[in-house]
Amino acid sequence: MAVSEIKATMKLKPLKAPVFHKRDKDLRGSFSDHLKHKESKLSPAQLEAFRNAYNFFTKDRTGCIDSHGLISTIAKLGMNLNTYDIYNELKCADLDRDGKINFSDFINVLTDKKLFLKAVVPEKKICLDLANNPGILLFEILSKFVETSSLHRKDIIELVSYFRKRFQESHSEIMWSSYGRRGLKSEICSPPRSSTAAFANSARISIMKERDLYKFLEALKRCNLRTDSPYSKIPVFPLFPDVDGTVMGKPFKDTQKIEMLRRKEPLTFFEDYFFNKRDWKTQAMNVKPLKSASGYSDDILAIDHLFKKKQHWTVTDAAAIKQHVKKATESYNLGIALDHRKEMLNLWKKIRGDLVGIESNNESFYNTFSTYTWSWNVCQELLSAKDLRLHDASMNKSSPSNSGLSSPSDFSESDPETGRKRKRKSSRGFRQ
């Protein structure tokens, strides 16, 4: 055989140049696969929690979630999404391609690692809106269930515990993927626009090492708060919202239904029901007047005498006398409150409270004075606005002329025109 023929048969193929970026990619993939944890099966409690969350959706006759049910559930939670995006989300969640989301599709989507990481740790250059990031709608709806406490507390605990565990298992993989994408580091000060990402960030802080936590705090301190932020200001609540102004806001849903239910409530004065005010004046009428010169009631003096008589007390003796001490203390507080109420009524007469509202053309002075009479003895106002109006009405009826609490001597003789105007206004008074 010729030498040329031997060279032709023994000719080797040319070596290919190594592709370093491909090798690096394969290395990252093998390391990522090595860090993958075996997906644990759902426990019966977790499966029941997912079932209850699935039952909260609006479903069709077959018990599945169709497009109309998804639209109804989104509207119920106050989320905004157009029809095209809803159909796109339905297509992503419909794994068996039957046009609906059954419970099997629901579980498979919410337990999928890629979709979970997509909802929790989105990349920086990917838009976090639901419209441009399909596949995370079910995670957002589940987060809304947790935020609004739509589910039972037991189910919420199971769901939060499950996703916290999933995030902790994926934490090492997240750190490696962020290392591979060095140019896509997320800014620590940018607030997450996804509620699921916010929950995940809180879980990340709980498992963060001390060194990483210090770095997180240092970066957080470098973020300057906006001076015009509403959270950096002290809130000022109006004393009387109906008088001080009206703040336009988003109208509540089913306002007519709520108004109808409110009108059906058999309540004479809604404020008494709302603040759970007790009728302390009726209780104070039953309190015996103070006869001793010390200024204390007979019950308190009897308890004081008992304390001086017996020096050593046991737990049984203290429990037996506890109710007597409580009763005597309440009687004393009611008596003090009743005396203070009389002083406040005298002050109302002295400052002519009914004329103050007439002169300023503002009836809110009744509420202002009522707030001023708040007492710790009964933990409420001693004189309500209703009590002051009833007092003025009784005083006007008892007076010989229907000129209110004012008398002709109160007006200046040198200004008869002003006196006639004030007398005309005071005779009109407020509507009782």
Curated annotation (Swiss-Prot):
GO molecular function, one term: calcium ion binding
Gene3D superfamilies with a match to the protein in the record: EF-hand
Keywords: Calcium, Metal-binding, Phosphoprotein, Repeat
Positions contributing to Ca(2+) binding: 94, 96, 98, 100, 105
Residue intervals of the EF-hand domain: 45-80, 81-116
Residues recorded with modification Phosphotyrosine: 273
Protein name: EF-hand calcium-binding domain-containing protein 3
Species whose genome carries this gene: Mus musculus (Mouse)
